[in-house]
């Protein structure tokens, strides 16, 4: 029944539902859209998106009725193309770090970018909801992510507090984002710097 109702919802209504579930005000939604717009304007991103700015409505529009937890329409391949290159992955990783340092909506944005871009973000837990009812309850767009290839635990020292985290899910990508389990500091990590 829940799945059947999704096809009658416009992207704007889906955004309203998500905003309500997340406790976001209209002003906060506008701020998130503004930040997503700035991401879209980054050269490495704009090339891949073909000039179409990212917004919450854009993301909501690709959540399908038939399989909302696994469908991303045309948006997913485009944004994944951005992180398929070292340049694109690095640009998006830097953007995420910038969000965490300066944007009051950073947690929501990081979750969205995590889903939409497939950029590995270590330390934020599982951000995928397989059940459409869970999607509606939590108000998060459940976009599919490729499975990450895990390696043996690797020590990594936080640049902020010198705490050593033993990362058990280091992705096989040249760049990823790590959140310190001690102080919460977020930093971009180059794969070559992790033993």
Curated annotation (Swiss-Prot):
Assembly factor active in membrane morphogenesis. This is Morphogenetic protein.
């Amino acid at each position: 029944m829940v799945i059947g109702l999704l096809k009658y919802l416009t992207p704007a209504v889906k955004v309203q539902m998500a905003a309500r579930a997340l406790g976001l005000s209209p002003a906060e939604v506008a701020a998130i859209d503004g930040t997503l717009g700035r991401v879209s304007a980054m050269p490495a991103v704009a090339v891949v998106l073909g000039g179409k700015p990212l917004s919450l409505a854009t993301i909501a529009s690709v959540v399908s009725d038939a399989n909302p937890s696994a469908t991303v329409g045309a948006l997913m391949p485009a944004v994944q193309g951005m992180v398929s290159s070292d340049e694109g992955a690095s640009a998006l990783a830097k953007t995420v770090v910038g969000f965490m340092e300066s944007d009051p909506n950073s947690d929501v944005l990081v979750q969205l970018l995590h889903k939409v871009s497939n950029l590995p973000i270590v330390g934020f837990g599982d951000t995928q909801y397989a059940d459409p009812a869970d999607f509606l309850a939590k108000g998060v767009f459940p976009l599919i992510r490729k499975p990450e290839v895990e390696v043996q635990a690797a020590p990594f020292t936080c640049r902020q507090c010198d705490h050593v985290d033993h990362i058990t899910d280091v992705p096989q990508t040249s760049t990823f984002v790590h959140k310190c389990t001690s102080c919460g500091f977020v930093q971009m990590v180059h794969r070559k710097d992790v033993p």
